[in-house]
């Protein structure tokens, strides 16, 4: 097996491998860091390369922490019936991974989100690493693997749900029975003239 396969196997069930001790030590530092932090190299090199990462100019990796669980809704200041408060059991229509991608895109407005992957979680938050690409960098424009990002059709792809996590949340990973109303989008379905 190659080195990447060993890393992949270890990350499949982190609790049963050496990754558990590594993560325990890492998370103590991660909790003290800002919510969006650029890092020098990916934590999971196998997953990053699988999703399109290359160690070259114009590509950076950012680690983002996002809260776990349901949405943190503010409590209304004026009186309301307890039944209509709308605080608990409110969940986002977006996945936490998609929220992480959008926050990374907001912090780096000149870059586009290529992909992202999970790196850890504790009782309060989850951490994702986001691969960002600068579409205007010459090394990106001249690389056929990434030049499609420079065409202009992919601006703000994280906010438009065009990343892998975004498409999954929009129901576009599935086809056939049960996915009839997912295309071209949930809101756009049925608007087309016959």
UniProtKB/Swiss-Prot annotation:
Highest taxon of the lineage: Archaea
Spans annotated as Disordered: 158-194
Family membership noted in the UniProt record: Belongs to the eukaryotic ribosomal protein eL15 family.
Gene: rpl15e
Keyword Ribosomal protein: yes
GO molecular function: RNA binding; structural constituent of ribosome
InterPro entries, alphabetized: Rbsml_eL15_core_dom_sf (IPR024794), Ribosomal_eL15 (IPR000439), Ribosomal_eL15_arc (IPR020926), Ribosomal_eL15_CS (IPR020925), Ribosomal_uL23/eL15/eS24_sf (IPR012678)
Species of provenance: Methanococcus maripaludis (strain DSM 14266 / JCM 13030 / NBRC 101832 / S2 / LL)
Keywords: Ribonucleoprotein, Ribosomal protein
GO biological process, alphabetically ordered: cytoplasmic translation
PROSITE patterns tied to this protein: RIBOSOMAL_L15E
Name of a matching Pfam family: Ribosomal_L15e
Name of the protein described by the UniProt record: Large ribosomal subunit protein eL15
């Amino acid at each position: 097996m190659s080195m990447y396969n060993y890393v992949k196997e270890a990350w499949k069930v982190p609790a049963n491998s050496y990754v558990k001790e590594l993560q325990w030590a890492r998370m103590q530092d991660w909790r003290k860091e800002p919510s969006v932090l650029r890092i020098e190299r990916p934590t999971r090199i196998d997953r990053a390369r699988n999703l399109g990462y290359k160690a070259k100019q114009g590509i950076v990796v950012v680690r983002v922490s996002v809260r776990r669980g349901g949405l943190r809704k503010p409590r209304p200041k004026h009186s309301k019936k307890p039944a209509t408060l709308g605080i608990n059991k409110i969940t986002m229509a977006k996945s936490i991974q998609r929220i992480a991608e959008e926050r990374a895109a907001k912090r780096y407005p000149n870059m586009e989100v290529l992909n992202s992957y999970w790196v850890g979680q504790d009782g309060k938050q989850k951490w994702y690493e986001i691969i960002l690409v600068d579409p205007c960098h010459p090394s990106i424009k001249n690389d056929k693997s990434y030049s499609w990002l420079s065409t202009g059709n992919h601006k703000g792809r994280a906010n438009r749900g065009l990343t892998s996590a975004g498409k999954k949340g929009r129901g576009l990973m599935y086809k056939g029975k049960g996915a009839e109303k997912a295309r071209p989008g949930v809101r756009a379905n049925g608007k087309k003239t016959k």
